[in-house]
Regions:
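ATP/NTP-dependent adenylation/nucleotidyl-transfer catalytic domains that generate, transfer
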Residues: 1-321
Length: 321
């Protein structure tokens, strides 16, 4: 097994990049560049070796690679150069026609351990698509009228899906009394009634919101370290909070937004339940334990607030970018 550490090359390639689709394209191209270089260093003849990928069917659909699908986002294993290699017979993808639940069925047939089969999926581009980047404010911080709640539209955007098409809109954050039944009913009503929003969040810690400011930033080691610390807290907490294994995946997202302060950032928890990942529902976890987790995350230097993503798929994709 040969492992190549390419993090410095990726940080350099992504320096100053903010747009989600551009980030994904750069990551896919860099992946191929490094693969070819390392193969050459190992004296591997490209005419005798194939590139193996763990591509699954949703990757192809969301990249617009099926007959009737529009592109939602480019997966790193579906950049144009990869498509050319597929046509040339240079790539092998043994599970490309399977959904994620079917991949797990194959894993069980092979006798793989449950801990390996049931672990949360992790995106090919890594935390790069969970670390949102902004140079300037993207839209305005403004209030929406939502009976029973304080509702603020945040000056940042995330990727979503409507039908087979991509959306790129704002999240709306709610503050008020927590009740899962109310939020379950309210969230889709809010996204369906506004062309400005494609996600709904609920405040966990750091509120009430009085001001929001953008903390300009792209992908840096420091920001990724902050996100890794938060993600570790979340994954460890889920061992206790989600003993029933309701959560299929829980991305932890870093937003370049400072709540009631300057120069800080915010964390979003995105636990979802799904079978095939083409659709998903946000997971309704024990709220008291989520609030306790939120307070622990606030102890991370530079984190000003914690939100809980209460958006289904559609209209919100599982990953924010």
């Amino acid at each position: 097994l040969h492992v190549y550490d390419a993090k410095d090359e990726y940080f350099e390639a992504l320096k100053g990049k903010y747009e989600p689709e551009e980030k994904r394209q750069i990551i896919g191209d860099k992946f191929l560049e490094i693969q070819r270089r390392v193969a050459k260093e190992l004296n591997l003849n490209p005419d005798e070796w194939l590139l193996g990928q763990g591509t699954i069917y949703p990757d192809t659909v969301e990249s617009g690679g099926t007959k009737n699908a529009h592109k939602i986002k480019t997966h790193h294993n579906r950049v144009p150069e990869i498509e050319e290699m597929i046509k040339a017979g240079k790539i092998i993808e043994p599970i490309k026609e399977l959904y994620k639940d079917e991949v797990r069925m194959v894993g069980r047939k092979l006798g793989l351990p449950d801990k390996m089969i049931d672990r949360h999926p992790f995106p090919g581009p890594g935390l790069a698509v969970r670390c949102l980047c902004l140079e300037n404010t993207d839209g305005e911080f403004k209030t929406h009228e939502v009976p029973g709640f304080t509702a603020h539209q945040l000056p940042v955007k995330s990727v979503g899906v409507q039908g087979d098409e991509r959306t790129y809109r704002h999240p709306l954050v709610l503050e008020g009394d927590h009740d899962w039944a109310t939020l379950r009913d309210l969230s889709p009503k809010l996204t369906n009634s506004s062309k400005e929003i494609n996600r709904v969040l609920f405040m966990v810690a750091g509120g009430p919101i009085e001001s929001v400011s953008v903390t300009p930033g792209y992908l840096t080691k420091e920001r990724i370290t902050t996100l890794q610390e938060a993600d570790k807290l979340v994954m460890n907490a889920l061992e206790e909070i989600d003993k029933e294994k309701l959560v299929w995946q829980c991305p932890t997202v870093l937003l370049p937004l400072s709540i009631n302060s300057e120069g800080q950032e915010s964390i979003v928890l995105r636990p979802i339940s799904s079978t095939n990942v083409m659709t998903a529902n946000f997971t309704e976890l024990n709220w008291q334990k989520i609030q306790e987790l939120g307070q622990e995350i606030l102890k991370i230097p530079g984190v000003s607030a914690v939100f809980y993503d209460i958006t289904n798929k559609p209209p919100g994709t599982i990953e924010w970018e």
